[in-house]
Amino acid sequence: MAIKLIAIDMDGTLLLPDHTISPAVKATIAAARERGVNVVLTTGRPYAGVHSYLKELHMEQPGDYCITYNGALVQKAGDGSTVAQTALSYDDYRFLEQLSREVGSHFHALDRNTLYTANRDISYYTVHESYVATIPLVFCEAEKMDPEIQLLKVMMIDEPAILDKAIARIPAEVKEKYTVLKSAPYFLEILDKRVNKGTGVKSLADALGIKPEEIMAIGDQENDIAMIEFAGVGVAMDNAIPAVKEAANFITKSNLEDGVAFAIEKYVLA
């Protein structure tokens, strides 16, 4: 069955290490779109960290979409307006922020427009997230957060060795109550239990009348597994972690070798 939608992770997949898109990848995405295929950037980033790439790829038309915050938000690519949203509550935030202190990790939280931290010793990785995602960073003590806030995800962030120790201390019931997954060695993302990239892709596909077998998903990290398993064609980058490769139907080349282009050529343009 022909592919009608391609869901592409950004960091480690679409993007080179310097956060640029190679000419070959741009060309194959454009060729797929010319054939009427929906190409959807599917990322843990907020819209602000995606918009410049959507513009670069000319993916801001009325029928273009993006999936942000690891599936918590499905948006129209042109203006960022909401198609579907699933958020964490203030009570979730207070519980998880306290948990981060108990397990020994830095912590931050994101709504649609702002990155919040209650850590006075703000982590380098929080600053890094603010820079890469081009989203403002605000210090706010946990008890002073707006009780009506709609947080799309929270994150434990730290040096990989410290974060791994913190993860090992997280009670099993927390991992059952929320979606808990790694997006990088220094990022642990925690979302509403109903949220992952797979549910985000499904929500959009249902709205567009596209079947799972008509979808290709490409990724490299733990947070990509759900959409790779959901898609009819799940593709792992050669630079992907082992669990992603195990979940995939096909292993393409690395992001340094235009792996996204190779997969699109094989399954869409051939």
PLM region descriptions:
Residues 1-5, 22, 189-270:
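Mg2+-dependent phosphoryl-transfer enzymes with acidic/Ser/Thr/Gly-rich catalytic loops
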Residues 4-17:
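Asp-based phosphoryl-transfer active-site loop
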Residues 23-124:
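Active-site phosphate-binding/coordination module
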Residues 25, 50-54, 166, 170, ...:
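Hydrophobic packing residues within well-ordered alpha-helices of enzyme cores
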Residues 32, 43, 70, 154, ...:
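Residue-level signal for inorganic ion chemistry
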Residues 36-40, 64, 153, 213-214, ...:
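Short active-site oxyanion
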Residues 62, 70, 174-176, 230-231, ...:
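Short, structured coil segments at secondary-structure junctions
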Residues 99-218, 239:
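Conserved acidic, metal-coordinating active-site core of Asp-based
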